């Protein structure tokens, strides 16, 4: 059967299901597609097809992720669901599945569990900005007071991690009942959930609306014209005549003007997020700029050397280290287009980090790099990836 092509005329939002093992994340994902399929806004997916998530590689790390898509009246959604807890950790840290918001699934019969807490913490650390709660398995709980108690617990937990627990939408339902009877009473709860997601999770700012940033991949000189920096525009728009800063690696930030933009050997007036370009820079010497620096809109991003990171360390089976590492470990941190050596300080009370762990630690780089909360990086040792991380906060 041919897949119906989604019309991309609605705003696009990336979301995913998070929560403790067996609380019903995959069943809910199946229920959303099945209920929305009744109105032709999705292709119904059953539990087994979502659970058999294909393997993907992101920054050298193997992750199992299922992707489904569906529509509501107002939006087009791409939704990720992971089979195992480790897949969530890797997914969120590598940014393989960037989420504009998440649906936290909590079983009403069990209440919040260890991974519920861990996924909320991860969401905070990696910058998932909004969470909507689906209290699942409510068909198994007869006691209204118990449901209220679980809801209060969830709200408290969200507040502990600086999410607005009191204002977060909490929908009570049963994914299994909705999946088994997509036109029945429980199916209405799926409709309520999607209305909450529609209204509570804002449409993300498009990459082209953000301030200009381009990591420099290569630099060369055109005789008589000047220095050209090439790379892929990460976000924003750059026009001929724009002022930009050259940021990172050097002690000070330099200012210059883009006097030409070239793509596929054609001269353009402007380039935008996703374009691979050469930017001709006025008054910049070949030695003033190098791979690993960034061109950016003045004042939009700053270089730092010290930051706290949320990190996943590859297991031996994934090609990572075979042995743990300790404080003062000095690997390379690969930001965008280059490696910078950094020194690791472990949190208090932690003596070592084992392969396969996810953890938080502080890093001090030997040279500054343009970064902000949410910037991703890989950790490498002799060219081999041994971990992946995300900047959780900056120690200026």
Curated annotation (Swiss-Prot):
EC numbers on record: 3.6.5.3
Binding site residues for Mg(2+): 26
Region (G1): 19-26
Family stated for the protein in its record: Belongs to the TRAFAC class translation factor GTPase superfamily. Classic translation factor GTPase family. EF-Tu/EF-1A subfamily.
Subunit structure: Monomer.
Protein task: GTP hydrolase that promotes the GTP-dependent binding of aminoacyl-tRNA to the A-site of ribosomes during protein biosynthesis.
Protein name (record): Elongation factor Tu
Main location: cytoplasm
Signal sequence coordinates: none
CDD domains, sorted: EF_Tu (cd01884), EFTU_II (cd03697), EFTU_III (cd03707)
SUPFAM superfamilies: EF-Tu/eEF-1alpha/eIF2-gamma C-terminal domain (SSF50465), P-loop containing nucleoside triphosphate hydrolases (SSF52540), Translation proteins (SSF50447)
tr-type G domain segment(s): 10-205
Cellular compartments annotated: Cytoplasm
Stretches the record annotates as G2: 60-64
GO CC terms in record: cytosol
UniProt region (G5), positions on chain: 174-176
């Amino acid at each position: 059967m041919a897949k119906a092509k989604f019309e991309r005329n609605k705003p696009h939002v990336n979301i995913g299901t998070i929560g403790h093992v067996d609380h019903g994340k995959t069943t809910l994902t199946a229920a959303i597609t099945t209920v929305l399929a009744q109105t032709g806004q999705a292709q119904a997916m059953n539990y087994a097809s979502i659970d058999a998530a294909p393997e993907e590689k992101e920054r050298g790390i193997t992750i199992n992720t299922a992707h489904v898509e569906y529509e509501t009246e107002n939006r087009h959604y791409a939704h990720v669901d992971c089979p195992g807890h480790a897949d969530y950790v890797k997914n969120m840290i590598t940014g393989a599945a960037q989420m504009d918001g998440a649906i936290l699934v909590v079983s009403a019969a069990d209440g919040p569990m260890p991974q519920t807490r861990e996924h909320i913490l991860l969401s905070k650390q990696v910058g998932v900005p909004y969470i909507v709660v689906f209290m699942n398995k409510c068909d198994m709980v007869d006691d209204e007071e118990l449901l209220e108690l679980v809801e209060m617990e969830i709200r408290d937990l969200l507040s502990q991690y600086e999410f607005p627990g009191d204002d977060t939408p909490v929908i009570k339902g049963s994914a299994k009942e909705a999946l088994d009877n997509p036109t029945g009473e429980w199916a209405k709860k799926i409709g309520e959930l999607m209305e909450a997601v529609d209204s509570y999770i804002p449409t993300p700012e498009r990459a082209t609306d953000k301030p200009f940033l381009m990591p420099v991949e290569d630099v060369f000189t055109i005789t008589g014209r000047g220095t050209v920096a090439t790379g892929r525009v990460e976000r924003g728009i750059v026009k001929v005549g724009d002022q930009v800063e050259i940021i990172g690696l050097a002690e000070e930030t330099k200012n210059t003007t883009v006097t030409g933009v070239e793509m596929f050997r054609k001269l353009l007036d402007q380039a935008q997020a996703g374009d691979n370009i050469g930017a001709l820079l006025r008054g910049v010497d070949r030695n003033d700029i190098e791979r690993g620096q960034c061109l950016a809109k003045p004042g939009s991003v700053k270089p730092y050397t010290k930051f706290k990171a949320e990190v996943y360390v590859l297991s031996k089976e994934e090609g990572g280290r075979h042995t743990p590492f300790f404080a003062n470990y000095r690997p390379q941190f690969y930001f965008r287009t280059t490696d910078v050596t950094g020194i690791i300080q472990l949190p208090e009370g932690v003596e070592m980090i084992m392969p396969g762990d996810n953890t938080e630690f502080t890093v001090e780089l030997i040279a500054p790099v343009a970064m902000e909360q949410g910037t991703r990086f890989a950790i490498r040792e002799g060219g081999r990836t041994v971990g992946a991380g995300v900047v959780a906060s900056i120690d200026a």
